[in-house]
């Protein structure tokens, strides 16, 4: 197993100057790249890492030349936010990364210097990032056999002039949020097939709906309407679902079977309740926090989905 790399082919094109310049939004944000709860992530540390990458990593230099470095800089901030959330989760869940396993992961990625270039961090942060990867996998493994959600919803497809599938899905989501007691009736409109069931995280793995396992569906509070696109690569199909309940079973059950990448993604999703509880604020020069995607987005138009609090949820 190697450290999960950061460089991705699909990036948005905005100038590097936007990343390296810009204005803060006030005294509480001006010297911070992000604020997680009461903890500030120093802006100068993020800028220092950006400068190191531009000076030492050819892939980062290529992105800068293509004017595509903005999305990469948001990934830097995202990883630091995730680290802060993970510190809270690890303390609550009693998780620890074995130092020997951390070393092995780094060595399997070519050592500290090569790993730094692979994942896009300064060498002195490689060990922290490797430990975070292991902890996220542990967190995912811990919740796979225990977590389930009770949902009612439907899949929205098809577009019409002036109305995309996302538009229609969002409109349905807002209707459900306004009258959650009518959710089954509302989702059945237009001949849609109603999804009204309890989804167990462990049962989704290996199924045709495996993509849902790491989705926002399992990270929101009960009484939230989730509007997401589970498989963007498979066409414009949007899931609209009211999460009526979220249950975490007792410990001691057999751990779920999943590959390390899937466990990592599920672990990341399990940080969503902590992010919601603590609050995450991003310096506007980098964008805004996307709770649906557990990432930093350029603006709300780039959110991975929509999370709408329902007005009431009747038992």
Question: Which ranges hold each PLM region?
Answer:
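C-terminal motif of bacterial Sec signal peptides marking the signal peptidase cleavage site
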Residues: 19-22
């Amino acid at each position: 197993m190697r450290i999960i790399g950061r460089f991705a082919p699909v990036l948005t094109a905005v100038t590097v100057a936007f990343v390296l310049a810009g204005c803060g939004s006030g005294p509480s944000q001006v010297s911070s790249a992000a604020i997680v709860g009461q903890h500030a992530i120093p802006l100068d540390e993020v800028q220092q890492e950006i400068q190191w990458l531009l000076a030492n990593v050819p892939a980062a230099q290529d992105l800068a030349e293509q004017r595509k470095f903005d999305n990469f800089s948001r990934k830097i901030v995202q990883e630091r936010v995730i680290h802060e959330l993970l510190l809270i989760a690890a303390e609550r869940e009693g998780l620890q990364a074995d130092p020997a396993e951390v070393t092995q992961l780094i060595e399997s990625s070519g050592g500290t210097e090569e790993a730094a270039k692979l994942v896009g961090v300064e060498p002195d942060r490689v060990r922290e990032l490797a430990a975070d990867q292991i902890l996220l996998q542990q967190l995912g493994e811990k919740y796979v056999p225990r977590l389930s959600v009770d949902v009612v919803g439907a899949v929205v497809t098809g577009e019409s002039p002036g109305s995309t599938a996302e538009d229609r899905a969002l409109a349905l989501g807002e209707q459900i949020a306004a009258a959650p007691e009518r959710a089954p009736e509302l989702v059945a409109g237009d001949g849609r097939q109603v999804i009204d069931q309890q989804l167990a995280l462990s049962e989704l793995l290996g199924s045709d709906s495996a993509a849902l396992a790491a989705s926002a569906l399992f990270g929101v509070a009960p009484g939230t309407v989730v509007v997401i696109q589970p498989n963007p690569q498979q066409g414009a199909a949007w899931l609209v679902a009211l999460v009526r309940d979220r249950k975490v079973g007792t410990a001691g059950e057999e751990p779920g079977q999943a590959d390390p990448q899937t466990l990592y993604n599920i672990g990341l999703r399990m940080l969503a309740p902590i992010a919601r509880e603590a609050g995450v604020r991003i310096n506007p020069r980098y964008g805004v926090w996307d709770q649906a995607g557990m990432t930093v987005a350029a603006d709300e138009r780039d959110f991975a989905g929509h999370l709408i609090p329902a007005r009431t949820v009747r038992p």
